Amino acid sequence: MKTFFLKEKQINKKWFVIDAEGLVVGRLAAFVATLLRGKHKPEYTPHMDCGDNVIIINAERVHFTGKKLKDKIYYKHTGYSGGLKKTTPDNILNGKFPERVIEMAVKRMLDDGPMARRRFENLYVYSGSEHKHQGQQPEKIDFASLNRKNKK
């Protein structure tokens, strides 16, 4: 029996929408990374972008467990000497772009490389409850009801 490999024409992408209000960031990011990679599908092929498109709304209302909201530190470097910058999730959520908390969590749960960058483009995060993808008729996923630990 030959191994089945998915062809580009056989890829069937769905659209999902998840309301992030009250959800735990890490659990949500792990679930979304699985959807973006397509690992939930029986026809998953590692070298193809067979994952689905995911829309996350209410990104500014996510929760962190424990004291991570104040104690967790995100690092980035400018490239210049002494250019190490630090910030916390609390600063990001109260800042100009609160959706970046979820974007960073999901991006860091995907592998590195060109395929992961292409998969990450299928993620759409909005801080409010409105999104501009109504024409795609996304399926709503109630992530909080999948496990009691998903919601805080």
UniProtKB/Swiss-Prot annotation:
Key words of the record: Ribonucleoprotein, Ribosomal protein
One GO cellular component term noted in the UniProt record for this chain: cytosolic large ribosomal subunit
Pfam (any one): Ribosomal_L13
Record keyword Ribosomal protein present: yes
UniProt-listed InterPro entries: Ribosomal_uL13, Ribosomal_uL13_bac-type, Ribosomal_uL13_sf
One Gene Ontology term from the biological process aspect of the record: negative regulation of translation
Residues annotated as transmembrane: none
Keyword Ribosomal protein: yes
SUPFAM superfamilies for the chain: Ribosomal protein L13
Single annotated GO MF: structural constituent of ribosome
Task performed by this protein: This protein is one of the early assembly proteins of the 50S ribosomal subunit, although it is not seen to bind rRNA by itself. It is important during the early stages of 50S assembly.
Subunit structure: Part of the 50S ribosomal subunit.
Similarity annotation: Belongs to the universal ribosomal protein uL13 family.
Name by which UniProt lists this protein: Large ribosomal subunit protein uL13
